[in-house]
Amino acid sequence: MRVDPMNNEIIEIGALKVRDGKVSERFMEFIKPQELISPAITGLTGISNDMVASARPARSVITDFIDFCEEDILIGHNIIFDYSFTKCTAAREGLPFEKMGIDTLKIAKKVHPELESKSLSALCEHYKIENKAAHRAYFDALATAKLYQTLSHYFEPDNPKTFKPSQLTYKIRKPQPATPKQLALLERLTKNKKTFSHNTEAFSCNA
């Protein structure tokens, strides 16, 4: 299943703050999407359309999440994936979102070259870390926090640079007008009775 921060929506944000090794604050909230949640996403996450029916819109939730983050460093597993969605959502609402971050996936690749899989689930299994609801935002965040603490305990003394935060970067691509070749292809497909939800004049591609 391929998702793209430019074309797909966030339906849930989950995060937590850790102070002195303990969870001090939590952020858990659904976002009301503009389109219906697909059966594939429901199958993966367990989140249904009924669950988000009364959720707040993206602008309201993302504003509160940015306030929640304050100046803290973000930690995530393949963090650029989550950061790209959050940044794109914020940008659509005219809100800035620039953060420093630490990626537990990059750390795992450095300190565990012998492991075939460095996915969050595989690493949690390796270290016997419980994840009560995999693919749900808050529980994945909690599992990642525990994973980071574990990796830091075992490996940071000998690999301090690996655990240093860095600036998270994701360039939001500006839509570009479709090329004449693309428009001609769409017209041919339309004549062959292939249907699209896009008006050809409004169709765009990302550079």
Regions found by a protein language model. Name each.
Residues 1-99, 113-135:
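Conserved non-catalytic scaffold segment of RNase H-like nuclease domains
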Residues 12, 122, 139-142, 188:
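A broad detector of short, well-ordered amphipathic alpha-helices
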Residues 89-92, 110, 126, 147-154, ...:
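Active-site catalytic microenvironments for nucleophilic, acid-base chemistry
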Residues 99-109:
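A short, structured active-site edge motif that brings together acidic residues
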Residues 136-149:
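Acidic, divalent-metal-coordinating active-site segment for phosphoryl/phosphodiester hydrolysis
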Residues 147-206:
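Acidic two-metal-ion nuclease catalytic site recognized across multiple nuclease folds
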